[in-house]
Amino acid sequence: MNYLIFKVIYANANIVVGEHNFIGYQIRIPKDYELEINKFCKLYLYEYISIMPNKNLIIKDLYGFRTYNERLLFIDLISINSIGPKTAINILKYDIDTIIDAIATKNIDYLITIKGINQRNANLICDQLNYKYINKVNDKNNWAKELSIGLENLGYTKKDIEYAITKVKINSQQDIDISEIISSAIKEISLRHEN
């Protein structure tokens, strides 16, 4: 199961209880998604199974994420030996783009500010995931260069271009066409001049 659309029965900052086809689900979430009770919601799911052989126990936990990219980062994080699901959830309480930038740039100082992450874990995360995310951050920086060149060719001032670069949101996990980015930037610049 990749995602689930369900009716929210209960929600707080850590857990959502939902119902789908008369089956109840308790789903752990990284942050408060401000879900409304009795409304429908879509979460991307990951089922984590832990086995305790000395107690003959199999524990299943369901984790839910608002975006598919959060789910992918969670899976990448728990693939690291010393990072379990609780630590991965703590990491995902922060902005996903900031976390990805920190991993790609090996910003250990930022990562150790996260609860549950020590120097050793931060080094492991960067060493094992850096190669995966560095290209995404470089792509994001390339978009800014292309946007700047495109707006300059259209006759916008340097001040407008700098403003547009700070306002246009480019998701580092998603492929976006440069023409879409330029049109978003033009809208931002237009709104600025209207005010």
Curated annotation (Swiss-Prot):
It is found in: Cytoplasm. Residues 141-195 are annotated as: Domain III. It comes from the Bacteria. Residues 1-66 are annotated as: Domain I. Gene3D superfamilies: 5' to 3' exonuclease, C-terminal subdomain (1.10.150.20). Residues 67-141 are annotated as: Domain II. NCBIfam families: ruvA (TIGR00084). The RuvA-RuvB-RuvC complex processes Holliday junction (HJ) DNA during genetic recombination and DNA repair, while the RuvA-RuvB complex plays an important role in the rescue of blocked DNA replication forks via replication fork reversal (RFR). RuvA specifically binds to HJ cruciform DNA, conferring on it an open structure. The RuvB hexamer acts as an ATP-dependent pump, pulling dsDNA into and through the RuvAB complex. HJ branch migration allows RuvC to scan DNA until it finds its consensus sequence, where it cleaves and resolves the cruciform DNA. This is Holliday junction branch migration complex subunit RuvA. It comes from Ureaplasma parvum serovar 3 (strain ATCC 700970). The lineage of its organism: Bacteria, Bacillati, Mycoplasmatota, Mycoplasmoidales, Mycoplasmoidaceae. The gene is ruvA.
